[in-house]
Amino acid sequence: EYSAEFCEMLSLRYPGLPVLQGDAYALEKTLRSGGGFLSGEKDTGHSLDGIVSSFPSLTRPEAVRKKLLNEALTLLKPGAPYLQFSYGLVMPVTPDSRAVSVHTSEWIWKNLPPARVWVYRKGH
């Protein structure tokens, strides 16, 4: 989570949940900064079981979104999911590689605003 205040509120509300404050667009640096998500400099990736993102990715330039997706897929175990919630009509990030599979949920109409979940996987 980017907001320190929101992290504090989440930590108080969910004391058993690890909450990490940082910038998702500097994902590896943020994950190395604390919480034990990535260990040390020798951990070069392929160690995470999944990533769930709900930030408004369509507000960022396509190049920034692609950089984040590529970094996330490098940090994930082969075939592990990167999930992106989106309210937009278009795919939030178009992968650079055919090695990345993309699947989407149906529209979730009970959510306001309606949303879809996009699932990206590499090496699956």
Label each residue range with its predicted role.
Residues 1-2:
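Conserved acidic E/D residue at the C-terminus of a beta-strand in Rossmann-like folds
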Residues 5-41:
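S-adenosyl-L-methionine
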Residues 5-8, 90-94:
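Short, charged/polar "capping" segments at the starts of alpha-helices
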Residues 46-64:
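A short SAM/SAH-binding and catalytic strip from SAM-dependent methyltransferases
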Residues 56-59, 87-92, 108-110:
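Short "lid" loop at the C-terminus of a central beta-strand within the Rossmann-like core
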Residues 66-78:
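A short glycine-rich, Lys/Arg-flanked "PGG" loop and its adjoining helix->strand segment in the class I
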Residues 76-88:
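Conserved beta-strand signature within the Rossmann-like core of class I S-adenosyl-L-methionine
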Residues 107-124:
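Core SAM-dependent methyltransferase catalytic element
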